[in-house]
């Protein structure tokens, strides 16, 4: 039984810089041993600033490195499946960025590969472990607003929004790399939370997404969960103004929150109660701590490939693909 997780990172870009990278060497029983990026100057710079002894420009070399026993894949989605399968093939556990893969077909391939192996794979739907979303789950589980009837997400973003992470090349709008567009960048977190809160899916309906729409600028759909909760979501990335809202309605009240602030509003019996939480410096650290615990057999998987595959399936249906 391993007593420590020695990580290698494939893809040392913006996400790994602050959101996730430092958490691998700040988490107990976890060390960042090696990093990979295709640009030599940039990978050396990353390694030097984060105190990482080993670097490479070759992903296969990192995967084969005997010093590491787990791989964090933080590349654009088009290479997620390729690198995950390679890591699984050599017996390395994997922490895989969202979206897990490009589409439902790739998701099925990965799910089957994990089933056939002894490797552990966690998907980085890290919002599950942030304080604000843990509080929402606590409120729902304690039946504060009674039995939940419905949940609605409304996301509107202008072309110049600052809610989307910026990169040198805007690969998020290139379907062959991202899977579709901005919807594929931000919706996985949001849809995953709905599945995390409400459980198994009964039925999925596509909404207004235009057929053959390349980058999915305007998407909507509905999900009926087996517990009776009706979810509806709309995403518009060419809106006149920004909107970011999720409202969960129950028999005795409602819970409202935003995905880009950390305030929860509970309305019940004519009274309003608010909760505010600060995110940790490295927002993925709570999820990475749970992932390390899972790899060391201390706790269950914080987000399985099967759970992430359902998110991918919902997105494919919403987009008509």
UniProtKB/Swiss-Prot annotation:
GO molecular function terms noted in the UniProt entry: nucleotide binding; oxidoreductase activity
Q: Does the keyword Oxidoreductase apply?
A: yes
Say if the entry is tagged with keyword Cell cycle: no
Q: Where in the cell is it found?
A: Cell surface
Query: EC?
Result: 1.-.-.-
* Pfam families associated with the record: GFO_IDH_MocA, GFO_IDH_MocA_C3
| Enzyme class of the recorded protein, top EC level | oxidoreductase
Q: Which GO terms describe its cellular component?
A: cell surface
Q: What induces it?
A: By ulvan.
Keywords noted in UniProt: Oxidoreductase
Q: Which superkingdom?
A: Bacteria
Give the function comment from the record: Oxidoreductase that may be involved in ulvan degradation. Ulvan is the main polysaccharide component of the Ulvales (green seaweed) cell wall. It is composed of disaccharide building blocks comprising 3-sulfated rhamnose (Rha3S) linked to D-glucuronic acid (GlcA), L-iduronic acid (IduA), or D-xylose (Xyl).
Q: Which family does it belong to?
A: Belongs to the Gfo/Idh/MocA family.
Protein name as catalogued: Oxidoreductase P35
Lineage of origin: Bacteria, Pseudomonadati, Bacteroidota, Flavobacteriia, Flavobacteriales
């Amino acid at each position: 039984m391993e007593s420590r997780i020695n990580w290698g990172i494939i893809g040392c870009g913006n996400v790994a810089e602050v959101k996730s990278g430092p958490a691998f060497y700040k988490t107990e029983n976890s060390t960042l041993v090696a990093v990979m990026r295709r640009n030599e100057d940039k990978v050396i710079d990353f390694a030097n600033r984060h105190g990482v002894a080993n670097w490479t420009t070759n992903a296969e070399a990192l995967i084969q490195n005997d010093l590491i026993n787990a791989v964090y894949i933080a590349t654009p989605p088009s290479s997620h499946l390729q690198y995950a399968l390679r890591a699984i093939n050599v017996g390395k556990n994997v922490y895989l960025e969202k979206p897990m893969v490009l589409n439902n077909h790739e998701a099925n391939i990965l799910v089957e590969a994990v089933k056939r192996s002894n490797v552990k794979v966690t998907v980085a739907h890290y919002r599950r472990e942030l304080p604000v979303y843990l509080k929402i789950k606590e409120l729902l589980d304690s039946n504060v607003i009674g039995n939940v009837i419905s949940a609605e997400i409304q996301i509107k973003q202008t072309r110049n929004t600052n809610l989307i992470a910026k990169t040198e090349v805007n690969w998020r709008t290139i379907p062959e790399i991202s899977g579709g567009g901005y919807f594929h960048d931000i919706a996985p977190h949001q849809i995953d939370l709905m599945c995390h809160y409400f459980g198994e899916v009964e039925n999925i309906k596509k909404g207004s997404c235009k057929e053959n729409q390349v980058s999915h600028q305007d998407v909507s759909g509905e999900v009926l969960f087996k517990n009776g909760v009706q979810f509806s979501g709309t995403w518009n990335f060419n809106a006149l103004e920004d909107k970011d809202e999720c409202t969960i309605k129950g028999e005795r009240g409602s819970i409202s929150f935003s995905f880009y602030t950390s305030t929860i509003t509970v309305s019940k019996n004519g009274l309003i109660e608010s909760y505010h939480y600060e995110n940790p410096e490295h927002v993925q650290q709570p999820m990475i701590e749970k992932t390390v615990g899972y790899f060391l057999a201390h706790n269950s998987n914080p987000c399985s490939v099967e759970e992430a595959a359902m998110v991918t399936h919902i997105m494919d249906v919403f987009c008509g693909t």
